Design a protein with these regions (language model features):
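Membrane-proximal helix-turn-helix segments that form the acceptor-binding/catalytic region
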Residues: 1-11
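Helix-loop-beta element that forms the nucleotide-linked donor phosphate-binding surface
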Residues: 8, 20-40
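Conserved donor-binding/catalytic core segment of Leloir-type glycosyltransferases
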Residues: 56-83, 93
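Nucleotide-activated donor-binding/catalytic signature segment of Leloir-type glycosyltransferases, i.e.
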Residues: 105-126
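Short alpha-helical donor nucleotide-sugar binding micro-motif in glycosyltransferases
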Residues: 122-123, 130-135
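Conserved acidic donor-binding segment of nucleotide-sugar-dependent glycosyltransferases
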Residues: 178-185, 193-196
C-alpha cells in the first residue's frame, strides 16, 4: 500500500519533513509531495474536581504522559526518570493504554504501579481536557514519531513540555531546554526536575 501510493499517486500529502525525507529516500519520490502539518482543535480549558479526586491528583502537581503504550513511546524511560526525581507531592500521570495487550504494555503497567504512577486508561472529552488544563508539564520520550499530535495538543494548552530530541520533535521548533537526548534517562530526569522545581 505505502509503496504503491508513493510511486503511483499523482500527489502525496505528508505531515512532517521527517516523512517527506523518508519518502524521498525510500521511494525516490521528491516531486508533487506536499507538506501539510497537522493541526489541533482550540483547547478546552476546564476543571473536573471529581475526576481528580478519583485519580488522587491535584491541579498543577503532576507530570502528564499521554500516548499509546507502545515500546517506541519509551514510557518506561519516563517512569525510570520520575523515580530519580525529588518530586515532593508531584505525581506522574500516564493517560493512555494499548489497543492490544502485549508483553511490553503488561510490563509497563506493572512498573508504573510499583512506582506509584497514576494510570488513567484511555481518556477523552472533559477528562482529557481537564488533565491537559492542569498538568505541571507534558513529557513525550518517544524514539519514533511522524508528527506527535499529543505534543501539539499539550502545547495548545501552553504546558511546559519535555520531549526527546528525535527529528519529528525537533521539527516542532521548541527551545533547546525542552529537549533531552533520546534514551538518556538521567538527562530526562534533569529536564523534569527543572520544570517541577
Amino acid at each position: 500500500g505505502e509503496r504503491l501510493g508513493c510511486r503511483f499517486a499523482d500527489d502525496v500529502i505528508v505531515i512532517s519533513e521527517v516523512i517527506q525525507d523518508l519518502i524521498a529516500r525510500k521511494y525516490h519520490r521528491r516531486e508533487r509531495v506536499h507538506l501539510i502539518y497537522n493541526g489541533v482543535p482550540k483547547p478546552e480549558i476546564c476543571d473536573y474536581p471529581e475526576y481528580f479526586e478519583e485519580l488522587g491528583i491535584e491541579k498543577g502537581k503532576y507530570i502528564l504522559g499521554m500516548c499509546h503504550f507502545e515500546k517506541k513511546k519509551n514510557l518506561h524511560h519516563l517512569i525510570e526518570a520520575f523515580k530519580k526525581l525529588e518530586a515532593g507531592d508531584c505525581k506522574l500521570v500516564l493517560a493512555g493504554d494499548t489497543d492490544f495487550e502485549d508483553e511490553y504494555s503488561l510490563g509497563l503497567k506493572k512498573m508504573a504501579q510499583e512506582a506509584g504512577v497514576v494510570l488513567t486508561g484511555f481518556v477523552k472529552g472533559h477528562k482529557l481536557h481537564s488533565l491537559l488544563t492542569n498538568a505541571r508539564c507534558y513529557c513525550l520520550p518517544s524514539s519514533h514519531e511522524g508528527l506527535p499530535i499529543a505534543l501539539l495538543e499539550a502545547m495548545s494548552y501552553h504546558l511546559p513540555v519535555v520531549v526527546s530530541n528525535i527529528p519529528a520533535n525537533l521539527e516542532v521548533g521548541l527551545s533547546s531546554d525542552c529537549y533531552f537526548h533520546c534514551g538518556d534517562v538521567d538527562a530526562l530526569a534533569a529536564r523534569l526536575q527543572k520544570v517541577i522545581d
